[in-house]
Amino acid sequence: MVRKFRYENDYPIVDTTCGKVHGYEYDDVIYFKGIPYARAERFCDPKAYTWDGVFEATAYGYSCPTIEEPALDYSLDFARKQELKDEACQNLNIWTPALDNEKRPVLVWLHGGGMSFGSSSEDGLCEGDNMCRFGRVVVVSLNHRLNLLGFCDLSDFGEKFKNSGNQGIADMVFALKWIRDNIAKFGGDPDNVMLFGQSGGGMKVTALLQTPEADGLFHKGLIMSGVQGGAMCDCNGSGKKMGEILMEETGCSNIEELCKVPVKELLGAGKIVRKKLKFLGYNAGEMPFYSDYYLGDPLIHPFRSETAHIPLLVGSTFGEFNAPFSYGISKHRMTDKEMEDKIKETLGEDLASKVIPLFKEAYPERPLVDVLSMDYMFRSYIRSYMKRRTELNDCTWEYIFNLDMPMLGGVSPLHGNDLGFVFNTTDRAPALQEPGVTEKVQKEVFDTVMAFAKTGNPNNGSIPAWEPSKPGDFKALVFGKETAVRRNFDAELNDCMAGELLEKQVQFMYDSVSGRIGG
């Protein structure tokens, strides 16, 4: 295979509203990386950033600082990378097939990591080159402020900090405005923009649907494992206590001094106070702040009628955070009795007797013991989301990614195992490779996402006919070895598991996230 690379003094160059950017072309895709779309003082609103001359957009920009320490990554199902961090993190990346006047769909990727960590460049599975190359679309990914830098409400300390609790969202809105004003020069259609994100990225899609300033800047959305509630819900109430303790921990006498504290010291102080504040019921600066700018989590507050017409795909993986249970067993070597005994040992006799027949009915293709690696947290929140949103429209579809990883005798799909299938990049993760299966399911998922991005309807020739869900009639497309649409198939099973175990699962997830961001 011959792959062409091109980089000239005058090509490829695009003159944006901020200044000229210089990228490169490789293998029929034109890349622009690290384009600054804004800059901001700490805790303050983003502002336009301009430059003279030509900006070299050939390397990823800074990601938002976090409290995490760099660590080696040993995963076989992702393609993790390290990145540089700085508060000047408002930058975006663009992949396009051509710099022409053709109006291609624009897909804007919002990275995962809750609202506290992550970046647009940390996972090679989420790079937009293959999506661009094989889907003939324009792909954009972006970085924005996170954690205390993006979501610490300091509005009690002055008008300058009025929206400090939502600056992460404000950055995303600013980026979407930049895309609206510039993407046509990159071969994209500003009137056909799809937001998509996984985990925290999906949460960002739900947040932008609840943000009036984002209205008109996007036209459809894909929410992957991103409908979350419980311990992950809104920061309600004033962040004044957080600000006071941060100043105390950093030795600052006023908010202006806090704005100048070295970022590592600031985030270190946040590590000390965040978990204590969370469980005392105070705003801990980790999620969007309910206000007239952001109108709240739709599982708690009303869905906005202004965005109810926007088509959505909403889904999750079969296993999510419960999938690691699969690591410790060889399920294909177990007898039915051994599976039932394991379920009874783990769940107790009463719960096991209820869920075993329900699981057999919902997932007849799966070994019975997989009920222990089945997600019921994300699925519960998605079902609540679907019930509420389908009362407002007929343009919301739900899916479940149900393909095991071919390792350790078959591991239920983890949180994020659908990423490579959406981006058409499964070849970058060894543990996703199963001959004759991976390519089939990748084509089904990828074609579905491309159809949805182009038309607002996910139906295409690679999947069965799939109608949007309606109240009381929920039709989930279950991607797997035998992809099929299933109607109202897991409600009783999910309610049974969640009713007994949801609170523990939410706490487990919260503790896992806290461990990563220093809670």
Regions found by a protein language model. Give the residues of each.
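Serine-hydrolase-like catalytic core of hydrolytic proteins
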Residues: 74-255, 303-324
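Mobile gating loops/cap/lid regions near enzyme active sites that modulate substrate access
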Residues: 379-519
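Non-catalytic accessory segments of hydrolases
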Residues: 1-166, 190, 432-445, 455-463, ...
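Non-transmembrane alpha-helical segments in soluble domains
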Residues: 107, 173-176, 180, 206-209, ...
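Active-site rim elements
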Residues: 78-80, 161-166, 229-234, 299, ...
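C-terminal, loop-rich substrate-recognition/catalytic regions characterized by aromatic stacking residues
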Residues: 307-354, 486-519
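Alpha/beta-hydrolase fold catalytic core
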Residues: 348-392, 397-402
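Substrate-access "cap/lid" subdomains that shape
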Residues: 181, 215, 224-339, 369-391
